[in-house]
Amino acid sequence: MNSDLALLRLLQLASPGLPVGGFTYSQGLEWAVEAGWVRGVDSFVGWQREQVHDTLACLDWPVLARLYRACQAEDAEAFGHWSRFLLANRETAELRLEEQQRGAALARLLDGWQLGQAPAWRASLELTQLGGMAWLAAHWAIPLRQLALGHGFAWLEGAVMAGVKLVPFGQQAAQTLLRDLGADLPAALDQALALGDDQLGGGLPLLAIASSRHETQYTRLFRS
């Protein structure tokens, strides 16, 4: 696949129109606002920046790299291992369910394209969204670094759009946040790709508490 077509496929994977429900989740932000932990743009920046340097850099991106390489090597066993590892590291029932729902939605898209149908792969593809993204990226010859940055920007965009509704702040502030927080991604990715297997894993106690409390929050805009 030529580089132009690979870029277009990456834009498709990173698009908010990808039918995986990306804008239906707040990943704990809704409770963080309710509790007063996030009160404005500055505290929102702190909330998201911690996730960039912990969740993305120490868990999601290193696992994405391993999933991608497993696809390139046609190693379904390794792919299944890292898919289960990622799911096990989602710290709350809400976050695990979100991951599985996103993964199942992307697997259904693959079904519609008659891709990823081999039994050795299909069950693992349903577990996480990252698994489906890695599989498609390897299939479409999207370079790993571009895949990770596309995934990171899509995640960041979803968080900022949730912030528009919840914090709240306006569209000008939202675009400024995407510009400024997005500038953190390349260096965080360098860190992520340098980690060994025994260094993987993230943990943000306030995020876990916020997600747990969101499960029973009385008034919610976002899915649990």
Swiss-Prot record:
Localization terms from the record: Cytoplasm
Signal peptide limits: none
Gene3D superfamilies xref list: Urease accessory protein UreF
Pfam family, any one: UreF
A molecular function GO annotation: nickel cation binding
Keyword Cytoplasm (UniProt): yes
Gene Ontology cellular-component annotations: cytoplasm
Keywords associated with the record: Chaperone, Cytoplasm, Nickel insertion
Subunit structure: UreD, UreF and UreG form a complex that acts as a GTP-hydrolysis-dependent molecular chaperone, activating the urease apoprotein by helping to assemble the nickel containing metallocenter of UreC. The UreE protein probably delivers the nickel.
PANTHER family: UREASE ACCESSORY PROTEIN F (PTHR33620:SF1)
Homology family: Belongs to the UreF family.
HAMAP family from the UniProt entry: UreF (MF_01385)
Functional summary from the UniProt entry: Required for maturation of urease via the functional incorporation of the urease nickel metallocenter.
Name under which the protein is recorded: Urease accessory protein UreF
Gene: ureF
